[in-house]
Regions:
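N-terminal localization/anchoring segments of enzymes in phospholipid and broader phosphate metabolism
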Residues: 1-119
Length: 119
């Protein structure tokens, strides 16, 4: 007897467990470089450091080769993401947005953060 599922399983997909930050960022960069149509990149934090620039440069390369890139960054976690970097990604054609800007209008908004990572 098969248990019904809300989601159909698609063959050809795979899951890989990444055990370190370095293997994660290598896999991210490879996935970005191999994208064929679009990239949805959502994250809590990107710093203007070697790792952050590595991922940003991969996204910019993708946009420059015609891939549609959507980039959503948490406003609180991304507070070190400079205006210069924002301009750089937008000039490359990346659709960039901040999630939940830090302007607090009620007591609940501070805890509404974008903690998931999607690529």
């Amino acid at each position: 007897m098969q248990i019904p599922s809300r989601h159909d399983y698609k063959y050809g997909h795979k899951i890989e467990l990444l055990r370190s930050g370095e293997s994660f960022f290598v896999a991210c960069e490879k996935t970005i470089d191999e994208a064929k149509q679009y990239i949805h990149f959502q994250t809590y934090i990107v710093d203007d450091d070697e790792t952050g620039r590595r991922i940003m440069n991969a996204l910019i390369r993708a946009a420059q080769r015609g891939i549609r890139v959507y980039f959503l960054l948490d406003a609180y976690g991304g507070n070190s993401f400079s205006k210069d970097l924002i301009n750089k990604v937008e000039e490359a054609g990346i659709l960039f947005r901040l999630f939940s800007p830090r302007l607090i209008t009620n007591g609940f908004q501070l805890s509404l953060r974008l903690h998931h990572k999607v690529l």
